[in-house]
Amino acid sequence: MDWLMGKSKAKPNGKKPAAEEKKVYLEPEHTKSRITDFEFKELVVLPREIDLNEWLASNTTTFFHHINLQYSTISEFCTGETCQTMAVCNTQYYWYDERGKKVKCTAPQYVDFVMSSVQKLVTDEDVFPTKYGREFPSSFESLVKKICKYLFHVLGHIYWAHFKETLALELHGHLNTLYVHFILFAREFNLLDPKETAVMDDLTEVLCSSPGNSGATGDGANSGASGAQNHVKER
């Protein structure tokens, strides 16, 4: 889990400001597309008699697999040529290896780092125990927060760089549904820093403010939305 101990930074990627670029994923005809009308706000609540860490582990693993699958549908379009940086809006993400060394990489390389690292974690019995009697590590919640942060980067990149391909494949309903479920779960348990998600606040507000999801925009969903995408982020 050394990769989680390193830093992660983001900075403007040199593109024109996001406000000047048309965000196709925000068009009403696309934001209303879902594969279910289920109220995810109810689904994410911790069930009675279920241990919190068990609930976090189960859902985090599920989100990892679903986001990995969603990315795989457009992976052939996400190449070192088309996506030379891991960008979301005007924000560029860098990877830091286990030695804390800054690694500038293409989007597909970044996603591969994320997915391979998370795969190792969720299959590690010392971190994500599945056998009766095994305890979760004391740092488990912080590890889940780190995982969610990187999975959010992947979702954001799909929207920002590959929504048109997702639209052509008619998988935007799946993407929207996954995004809503993921964000509501993360907000329910404070797994994502509002400053981290500010880059996608416009989409979050539209998708998560529908009936049944009205509680999702709390916890600073709109804090920093005004001009937040033009600021350098370091984390």
Curated annotation (Swiss-Prot):
Function: Stimulates the autophosphorylation and kinase activity of STK38 and STK38L.
Subcellular locations according to the entry: Nucleus; Cytoplasm, Perinuclear region
Organism: Mus musculus
PANTHER family from the UniProt entry: MPS ONE BINDER KINASE ACTIVATOR-LIKE MOB (PTHR22599)
Binding site for Zn(2+): C78, C83, H157, H162
Gene Ontology CC terms: cytoplasm; neuron projection terminus; nucleus; perinuclear region of cytoplasm
Post-translational events: Phosphorylated.
Keyword terms, alphabetized: Cytoplasm, Metal-binding, Nucleus, Phosphoprotein, Zinc
Coiled coil: none
Protein family according to the UniProt entry: Belongs to the MOB1/phocein family.
Keyword DNA damage annotated: no
Name of the featured protein: MOB kinase activator 2
Primary site of residence: nucleus
GO molecular function: metal ion binding
Region ranges (Disordered): 1-22, 213-235
Complex and partners: Binds STK38 and STK38L.
